[in-house]
Amino acid sequence: MTDLTEKNTALEEEKIESAVENQQKSIWKEIFAQGIWKNNPAVVQLLGLCPLLAVSSTATNALGLGLATMLVLTCTNTVISLFRQYIPKEIRIPIYVMIIATTVTAVQLLMNAYTYTLYQSLGIFIPLIVTNCIIIGRAEAFASKNSLLHSIWDGFSMGLGMALSLTILGALREIIGQGTIFEGIENLFGEQAKFLTHHIYHTDSSFLLFILPPGAFIGLGLLLAIKNRIDNVKK
């Protein structure tokens, strides 16, 4: 009788552990899904439109800014979550901005040192990451209220979602406007990355509509339409 009770207790404990483990896995998956698709900062929240539309003229520029944004998001979420209990609620926003500005400055200096051509190309949009609503929004809505690991994962997921949206829009505009993709990628990853550059079609003149700001709005509209269509089909 005692053995049977012990077995039942052990089985119950295993079930509880399994349920907790599954719940943890579902949390990680949900955070990732929110950043990549369900609550994508670019095509759902429509945040950070200024750099999204201005820098996405080529896939390389878009990818560079996307990676910088992802790095800043991950780092700021990490720091804010780590010190969330010590940050006074009354002055939390200025403190968040200081943390974000410090991180952006570090990223800017790194890009200036190692990817100077891309740094010149992105120009003012690197320091403008400080004012990006995505970063301050995730700091306030998630990092200040959740555990360190979940906050790191949220920052990475949201940053990756933004980087993917930027790169897809940049690739679309570059292909239609210039007939190339990842032109100048060696400025970001070095000479060994030149194999990523492809000439889709050869043209003597560029399709200026897609290179200029109107093309950014058209491309973003197409991305929004495709996402909404996929969501409607899933329903």
From Swiss-Prot:
UniProt family annotation: Belongs to the NqrDE/RnfAE family.
Keywords from the UniProt entry: Cell inner membrane, Cell membrane, Electron transport, Membrane, Translocase, Transmembrane, Transmembrane helix, Transport
HAMAP family noted in UniProt: RsxE_RnfE (MF_00478)
GO biological process, one term: electron transport chain
NCBIfam families to which the protein is assigned, alphabetical: PRK12405.1 (NF009070), rnfE (TIGR01948)
Primary subcellular site in the record, as a coarse category: membrane
Enzyme class: translocase
Parts of the chain that traverse the membrane: 63-83, 93-113, 117-137, 152-172, 206-226
Pfam families: Rnf-Nqr (PF02508)
Recorded superkingdom: Bacteria
Location within or outside the cell: Cell inner membrane
Any one annotated GO CC term: plasma membrane
Function text: Part of a membrane-bound complex that couples electron transfer with translocation of ions across the membrane.
Organism: Haemophilus influenzae (strain 86-028NP)
Membrane topology: Multi-pass membrane protein
EC number per UniProt: 7.-.-.-
Oligomer status and interactors: The complex is composed of six subunits: RnfA, RnfB, RnfC, RnfD, RnfE and RnfG.
Descriptive protein name: Ion-translocating oxidoreductase complex subunit E
